[in-house]
């Protein structure tokens, strides 16, 4: 399934896929056309940011060599896992996924699953209409989204709680962080993981 998924993304397609939290939509984060299709399926404004997902932490760290040592240690403490990390993005990597702020990158590395062998990064967003409920199973994914996608990957029933969003933009320089959206991982768990590093 990983090869089919990679082929879909590389061709500029949009896929419904299972993350470690809820079902998502994925596309090539460097393709303006693919991103426009994904946002059109969701009914989401094109200037809203979305996370870039790597399927292993090693690939994420390789793609972002400019990360400082403190930030890299934080990523090693928190990922893979059900957190979306907002990072300072001084080189404006993946600007099409960053919305109106190319200097902030949302990063996701899910816990291992059916797509762990995928080598390409994807831009990802939950597989729902903008503002809709987060789908735990394919049956809960809107029919129009399933039909509009080029590939649908079934990962069974998922936990159903979206990722926690944590802002680490000031972590590298000042050690500061904050949770912007509470989700599958608690603030206490994040604090504990960071303190252990």
Predicted region positions:
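Active-site-adjacent structural elements in enzyme catalytic cores
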Residues: 1-197
């Amino acid at each position: 399934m990983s090869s089919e998924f990679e082929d879909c993304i590389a061709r500029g397609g949009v896929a419904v896929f299972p993350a470690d939290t809820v079902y998502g939509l994925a596309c090539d984060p460097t393709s303006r056309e693919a991103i426009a299709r994904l946002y059109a399926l969701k009914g989401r404004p094109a200037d809203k940011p979305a996370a870039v997902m790597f399927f292993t932490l090693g690939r994420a760290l390789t793609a972002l060599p400019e990360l400082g040592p403190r930030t890299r240690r934080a990523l090693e403490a928190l990922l893979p896992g059900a957190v979306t990390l907002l990072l300072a993005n001084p080189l404006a990597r993946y600007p099409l996924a960053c919305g109106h702020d190319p200097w902030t990158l949302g990063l996701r590395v899910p816990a291992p699953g059916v797509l762990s062998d995928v080598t390409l990064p994807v831009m990802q967003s939950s597989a729902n209409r903008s503002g809709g409920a987060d789908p735990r199973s394919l049956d809960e994914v809107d029919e129009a989204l399933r039909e509009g996608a080029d590939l649908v990957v079934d990962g069974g029933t998922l936990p159903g709680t979206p990722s926690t969003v944590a802002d680490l933009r000031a972590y590298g320089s000042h050690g500061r962080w904050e949770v912007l959206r509470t989700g599958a991982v608690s603030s206490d768990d994040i604090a504990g993981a960071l303190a252990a590093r």
